[in-house]
Every structure is written in structure tokens, then in C-alpha cells.
Amino acid sequence: MDNLLPQSRFSYFKKYPIHAIRKYLSMLRNQKEEEQVARFQKIPNAENETMIPVLTSKKASELPVSEVASILQADLQNGLNKCEVSHRRAFHGWNEFDISEDEPLWKKYISQFKNPLIMLLLASAVISVLMHQFDDAVSITVAILIVVTVAFVQEYRSEKSLEELSKLMPPECHCVREGKLEHTLARDLVPGDTVCLSVGDRVPADLRLFEAVDLSVDESSLTGETTPCSKVTAPQPAATNGDLASRSNIAFMGTLVRCGKAKGIVIGTGENSEFGEVFKMMQAEEAPKTPLQKSMDLLGKQLSFYSFGIIGIIMLVGWLLGKDILEMFTISVSLAVAAIPEGLPIVVTVTLALGVMRMVKKRAIVKKLPIVETLGCCNVICSDKTGTLTKNEMTVTHIFTSDGLRAEVTGVGYNPFGEVIVDGDVVHGFYNPSVSRIVEAGCVCNDAVIRNNTLMGKPTEGALIALAMKMGLDGLQQDYIRKAEYPFSSEQKWMAVKCVHRTQQDRPEICFMKGAYEQVIKYCTTYHSKGQTLTLTQQQRDLYQQEKAQMGSAGLRVLALASGPELGQLTFLGLVGIIDPPRTGVKEAVTTLIASGVSIKMITGDSQETAVAIASRLGLYSKTSQSVSGEEIDAMDVQQLSQIVPKVAVFYRASPRHKMKIIKSLQKNGSVVAMTGDGVNDAVALKAADIGVAMGQTGTDVCKEAADMILVDDDFQTIMSAIEEGKGIYNNIKNFVRFQLSTSIAALTLISLATLMNFPNPLNAMQILWINIIMDGPPAQSLGVEPVDKDVIRKPPRNWKDSILTKNLILKILVSSIIIVCGTLFVFWRELRDNVITPRDTTMTFTCFVFFDMFNALSSRSQTKSVFEIGLCSNKMFCYAVLGSIMGQLLVIYFPPLQKVFQTESLSILDLLFLLGLTSSVCIVAEIIKKVERSREKIQKPVSSTSSSFLEV
């Protein structure tokens, strides 16, 4: 019978078609699900019942775990069932960031044409086509397409910051559901889920912890705190959990478990987490327009205004003189189109692109072209402390032994490079027992490991291992066998281990302890002094307390160390001072920047003592400086903060929201703000600042994507080079504007005067086209690659409100234009004495204007320095461009086929020498003006040095 049973079952199913079997199985599955629903009455009906709320981390930290579980209707041990999870997900959504679909790429491309200068050029191109000036139309269109495409590519590349946030969410996690531990996707989590954490895990959502064993979480990417936070499960009083760093019973999404294990209940997912707050701020924040973009917009509007003004004036005068109105309109529009510098956008783009290439050589990646120039008018740098001004590598710098010896420790980071120096002598191994006992205790009572200069474990423990490596004692960790361990907790604030030496296992066990001085000293009854063990007196306790206070006031994190046979009978060994040290070269860069008129402010999540100590070491903080906390910022309105923010050097306990508020206040005061940072907590501020600067090595992906510039080797000094580059680029753009506008105005005036005064036209159409090519061609373009003046870093940042067309620049443009017009008209009048226009007349006039152009370009290479001071051949591209233009002009004059096209004839050597002498006047006058200006500056310098400028923020 048993043998027949399987066959009979198979025979039973054989009677029915396959679709009937499927229907039967589906019915059983539905019945099972209905039973589950009946069993779990907590499942709310989507239409009739209230959905599970989302708790804020602040509220959840104040409540007992049982109350949190009750509010979230969760079972801490068994977790949620799958039906409940599905229903909650339908309401709360996936545990991910919803990056909304942006407008199509073609719309983004079209939006680039909204620039006033681009719109003006478009109008010029259309008019050129209507007037059959196809050469102009093609050149203008090509210029527009190049500029618009470059701007589009830069903008597209910069819009990745929101997508990068999702990378900090772990793809998978361990979650308890229906009483079973599951390996599930982090995006599947919902409020009320139970999550298990262990070493190396990245927290998948905001969790209210209900179990924690020696749990330590690295929150530096979110809060800026260097030291991993020890976590507990007890409720937190409302008065003590104001900032994220103080919520010790919450594990935040995106942070990293450094030590221990824990369980927590999900209180916030996706955008409802603290990480989500950063995401929403980034989504709402728009990158501000750069000063150069504002200047270009203003210049475009000014040129539009002047162009329409010219059209109106010429038409009015022509009408008053009785000329044909349509003919006058045609002439005036042609002149206005010719006067518009279509080469300006290309020169700006090329100049910025070359600046970006030079910055790459200096180990800085600039993601947005205009940002290079913006650095030139930056007058405030807000810098994150951790990882930017400091290395984010905890390092022991001071040792104080129980018998009063003080040792200094050199070297930085988790490596053996450095020395321990006592009274000028280098200490190594067991040469100094007082020091070596401290190092031994710190090395043995330690769970950290350093491999290939990379730390695995807590930063403070890594600092102690690095200290042992410097003394050649790091092998002590393997010399002892650990028998018992008393893990660190935030309540007891110490860690201890009970060990025996591998070679002396028959001897009594020895305890090693490290931790907060106030706690360790309670377990000590004796202290070491010059090889002897003496009873610990109150006088000695006071001495150690005083030394600990001094180290703390210097911004050091102080650890006490002890050893002995039992926890209650320990011998006090001494103190070590640990700090996250400043980066090499930062102090020098800070000094140079401050001297050049740039104010630097430190913004950090660290404590006031640590922040002020580091700022003092870097020269950012003095006795007269102020420091403000994040809580104080919250208590101020925008007006109050705007008044106080220029006077503050250090902002401590600052969250991403505080950083945003600080930057907005500075910008409201008219400052151009650069923000440096490396963590997720910096991303929003980096995007809001005029210039966001991220660290390349230590920076998170989110931070790098939100930034405008990335320092490849994390060198703060590179910012100084970038500012120098920015100032130089702006000078080059001004040089180009001066040259092109002076030449354009001269050509415009020359033809306008001839038209309005019924003179014969001094230049024919082909000659005007050739001049237009030179105006926008190689000589003009080469001004954009003029080497950066090394003196520029000493100049104060320019006011971003200033137009490119300053009064001084307009004066120089007009002077050059007047000289060119007068000189060219003089030649034309001189050749026209016979009252008959011949090819020689136009050739002399044409060549005169071209030579004026070359000398005008030469004088435009610098607004302040003499041509001989900067070097005639320092800009090789300029030399080649001018030489090429002159060769082209000579071909036009002497090459027969071109003579027919341009209606020219050969000139004598004396003619050329006469023209060279006359046209050099524009350069000579410009050099005289520079000399007068420099002399005036020297006289005014003592007066101006005593007055404050707009830069002092």
C-alpha cells in the first residue's frame, strides 16, 4: 500500500488539466494569506485606519524603547510580518531618495540661450542672414554654439549630487521579520522594522537602539565629529539632545559601525531620515550665479542698450538730413551688428578652459568653468575642520608620565614615522621605563589594528598603536594573551583587559586600563616614580588633574593609563594627549590669504575647546576673536546673525542647516563665499556657497558631486593658487574687452562719421570684413592666454558688484578709440587731397587701421604694467598671432590675386614706416597713462592702507 501511495497521488492529479491544478494551488495560497491577516489584527485598512507615524530622531531619543515600539506598532523581537511591511511601504514608500525626473536634456540645452549676450548675438546672426551677410552669420552662430555647448556640458556634469546620496545607503542589511533574521535590501525597510548591526555595517535607516554592546559609530560624514560616538539604549532628556551628535541612542542612516553590535527599530526611512533632511536641503538649494556670469549678463545688456541707441541716433540724424529712412536703417543695423563683440563669449570660454587646465596641473579639478574666475573675487572662506584643515587622523602629540616627565611626539597619522622626545633625547623601545609603560598599556589595552597605514578600529586606539610603532613597541600587542575584557561604554568611560605574557603564563595575570582620567584614577592606589611604586596621594591626584586640564585647554583629547594585578589595585602610569592635527602647509596658506584680504572662518561639529585650539594653531583665532555654537545660531534671527557673522572666527557644534544659515548671512552682507569640506554634512553648504571646494582623497562622493572644485591631494594651499588664477583670468578678460571694444568703437565711429557727413567710404566691404576678422581673431584670442601676473595674489579681491566696464576701463577704451579714429581719418584726409578715391587711398587707410589694431592689442596685454615690464615675448601665442596678422596684411597689399579682392595696391617702405610711426601712438599714450596711474597709486597707498575696504568681513 505504501508503495502505491505516491503513484495514486500522481494518478489523482493526472485526472485534472494543468490550469485546474494552478487554480487549486492559488486558492490554497489565498486561503493561507487570509489566515495570516486574521492572525495579525494590527494590519490597518488603507481606507479606514490611521497609518503608522514616522518619529523624528529627536522625539524617539526622548522616549523609552517600549513607547517607541508602541507608537510604531512593532514587535522588537519578532519584527513585522510581510503583509504589514507591504502595507507600510505603500504609505511610506521605499527607503531611498526620490530623485525626480528632471526636464529633458534638449530643454536644458535650450535654456542656455537665455543669457542676454547670447540672445543679442542670436539677433545679430538673424539680421546678418536677412541682410545677406552670411560670413558674419556663420561666425556668430559658431561662436554661440561653442559657448552654449560648453555651458550645457558643465551644468549637466554638476547635477549629480542628489544621485550620489543614495550611494551612502547600504544595498543590503540584516532585518528581523516574522521571527527570522533575514538578509534583505536596505530599500525594503519600513518604519517599525527591527535591524541588526555589526562591525563594518553602514546604518541603513534612522534607528532607535534597544540593544547595544560596546557600540561605537563613526558619524563624521554626517555631524563632522572626528571621534566615533559610543551608543546607548537609555532615553535621552529633551534638554540634552539638541544636536545630532548628542543623540546617543540613535543610529543615523549612512553612518558607519566601527565597533560592537546592536539592534534597533527603524524610526525614519528615505527622506524622513536625518540624511533625508540633507537631501531635501540639497534638492531645494540652487547654485548661485557666479560674479563673471553676472558681469557678462550686465555687459550683454549694456551692449544691447548701446546698439539700439546707435540705431536710433543714426536713423534720426539721417532722417533729419533728408536721407532715405530704409537705407539709414540698413546702415545703422549693419554697424550695430558689427560693433557687437561676437568673439567675447569664445574668449571668455577659452580663457576659463585654459585656467581649468592650469589648475589640473596644480592638483585641482574645476567642474564649472566660471568658478575659476569667481575665486578671484572670493573674500570669505568658510572651512570645515575635520579632513580639510586637519587630517582626520587622531595622533598622540603629548605624554605626561606619573613621575612628571613630559614627552613630545612628532609625526602625523597611522604610521611609524615620527619620534618620541624627552628632554631633547629620542626615546625608543624600553629606554625610558616611565614612557614605555604608558605605551605598553595603550598598545595591549587596544582592539585596533593598523595595516599598510590604514586603521581598522577606533581612531583614538589607532593613535595609541601608532605611538607604539614610533617606539618600536607595537609587537607588544601579540606578546600578551587576553584572558578577560571589560569593553568601553559611555557610562563607565574606560576599557580594561586582563592578560598574561606568552612567555610567562605561570605568573599572575596583569590588568591594563585606559579611559577618562576621572574614571581611571578611581581604580588606582599607587603610582610609578623613578622605578619605585609609591602610594597615590591627594597631592599627586591634584597634579595629574592640573596636567589633564592643561592638555584639555589646548584642545587635546586626554586618556589616562594604568596597570596592576586587579582593577581596584592599579598603578597610575600617566596621561596621553591626542589631537586631529592640522594639515601641513595650511597655516602658511591661511596667513597669505588673510594678508591678501580674505577672511577665513572655521565651521565644525566639534566641541568649542577642540575647535578653538585648532583655529589658534592655524592663526585663525586670537584673544579678540569670537566663537559661536550651533545652538546660539538657532536662537538668532537672520538680521542678528548677519550682524554678528562677520566678527566670528569659529563656529562649533554646527549642523548642515547651521552651515547653510552662516553662508546665506555672509552672502546677504555682500560677501563672495567659498566653502571647503569633505563630508556629507558639508554637501548642502558646498552647493549653496559661491564656490564649493571638496577634498579629493578624504571627501565623500556626495561632497565631490556637490562641489565646484575638488582638491586632488587635499592641499588647502591649492585654494591660494586658484584665487591667484581667478584674479589673473579676470584681468585677461578685461584686457580682451578693452581691445575689442576700443577697436569696435573706432571702426563704428569711422564709418558712421563718413556716412553721416557724406564723405566717401574710407573702407570697402572686404576691408571691413578683414578688420572684423582681426578684431575677433588670433590677436584678440591670444589676450585670453596672457600669463598670470604673480603680483596679483597680493591684490585684494575685487567687488563682485563692479561691472567689467569700469569708469577707468571705459576711459581707456575711449582714449584708444579716439586716437585710432583721428589717426585713420588723418591718413584718409592726407591721401584724399586730390578729391579722387584711388586704391592707394583705401590701402593706406586700411593698413593704418590694421596697424593701429596691432599696437592697441599690444598695449591691452596689461592694464597696469608696461609692455617691457611683462616682457614683449612672454605670451608666445600673442607674438605668433600678431606676426600672422601682419603677414596676412602684407599679402593683402602685395599679393596680386588678393589685391584684386581687397582693391589694394603696393605701398613703399617709406609708407609702411610712416604708418608704423603714426599707429604706435596708441601704444605710447596707453603706456603714459599706465605710468601716471602707478605714480598716483604710490602717492595714495599710505592713505588707503589706513582705511578699511569692503573686503573686511
UniProtKB/Swiss-Prot annotation:
The lineage of its organism: Eukaryota, Metazoa, Chordata, Craniata, Vertebrata. Monomer. Homodimer. Residues 126-138, 317-328, 754-763, 825-842, 895-909 are lumenal. Belongs to the cation transport ATPase (P-type) (TC 3.A.3) family. Type IIA subfamily. GO terms for cellular component: cis-Golgi network membrane; endoplasmic reticulum; Golgi apparatus; Golgi cisterna membrane; Golgi membrane; plasma membrane; trans-Golgi network. The active site is at 384 (4-aspartylphosphate intermediate). The chain crosses the membrane at residues 105-125, 139-157, 297-316, 329-346, 734-753, 764-784, 805-824, 843-862, 876-894, 910-930. Its main location: Golgi. Ca(2+) binds at residues 337-338, 340, 342, 772, 776. The gene is ATP2C1. It comes from Bos taurus (Bovine). It catalyses: Ca(2+)(in) + ATP + H2O = Ca(2+)(out) + ADP + phosphate + H(+); Mn(2+)(in) + ATP + H2O = Mn(2+)(out) + ADP + phosphate + H(+). Mg(2+) binds at residues 678, 682. It is a multi-pass membrane protein. Keywords: ATP-binding, Calcium, Calcium transport, Golgi apparatus, Ion transport, Magnesium, Membrane, Metal-binding, Nucleotide-binding, Translocase, Transmembrane, Transmembrane helix, Transport. It is an enzyme of class 7 (translocase). ATP-driven pump that supplies the Golgi apparatus with Ca(2+) and Mn(2+) ions, both essential cofactors for processing and trafficking of newly synthesized proteins in the secretory pathway. Within a catalytic cycle, acquires Ca(2+) or Mn(2+) ions on the cytoplasmic side of the membrane and delivers them to the lumenal side. The transfer of ions across the membrane is coupled to ATP hydrolysis and is associated with a transient phosphorylation that shifts the pump conformation from inward-facing to outward-facing state. GO terms for molecular function: ATP binding; ATP hydrolysis activity; calcium ion binding; manganese ion binding; P-type calcium transporter activity; P-type manganese transporter activity. Residues 1-104, 158-296, 347-733, 785-804, 863-875, 931-953 are cytoplasmic. PANTHER family: CALCIUM-TRANSPORTING ATPASE. This is Calcium-transporting ATPase type 2C member 1. Its EC number is 7.2.2.10. It is found in: Golgi apparatus, trans-Golgi network membrane; Golgi apparatus, Golgi stack membrane. One of its GO terms (biological process) is Golgi calcium ion homeostasis.
